[in-house]
Amino acid sequence: MGFWKFLPFLVLSFLVVYQAGMFQAAPFRSALENDFDPAILTEKEMCLLLAAVMNDYVQMKTSELKQEAEHFHITAQKRSCNRATCVTHKMAGSLSRSGSEIKRNFMSTNVGSKAFGQRSRDLQK
């Protein structure tokens, strides 16, 4: 139903734009009428043209590299996290790596699965 309301508006706007002269075609030029001939360029003009092409190419490659660097930076930011779970995992990893040093420096507290069911007289031996 909405299409039938839109169609007359579309046709009317097309006619208004056509009458205003917006849809006039550009004059057709054949390839033979082209004024640009690379054979008649001077050496200075060729150097300027080459420099302009190279400058555009370098700018294009620079913008592509910046976009890739931004994408890499975004993925690196996603990996680094400061939430409590991430910090806990980092601390657990550092504790597991330094576990042997902790066992050497501190005495055992007799807590855990090995201490379950032991009596106080067994612990005093």
From Swiss-Prot:
**Subcellular location field:** Secreted
Give the top-rank taxon of the lineage listed in the UniProt record for this protein: Eukaryota
User: Which ranges are cleaved off as propeptide?
Assistant: 26-77
Disulfide bond annotation, renumbered to this chain = 81-86
Q: Which Gene3D superfamilies match?
A: 6.10.250.2190
Q: Which UniProt keywords apply?
A: Cleavage on pair of basic residues, Disulfide bond, Receptor, Secreted, Signal
SMART domains in the record: CALCITONIN
Q: What one GO molecular function would you report for this record?
A: hormone activity
Taxonomic source organism? Capra hircus (Goat)
GO biological process annotation, one example? adenylate cyclase-activating G protein-coupled receptor signaling pathway
- InterPro entries per the record? Calcitonin-like, Calcitonin/adrenomedullin, Calcitonin_gene-rel_peptide, Calcitonin_peptide-like
Q: Which residues form the signal peptide?
A: 1-25
Q: Which is a Pfam family this sequence falls into? A: Calc_CGRP_IAPP
GO CC entries? extracellular space
The family annotation for this protein states: Belongs to the calcitonin family.
Question: Protein name, please?
Answer: Calcitonin receptor-stimulating peptide 2
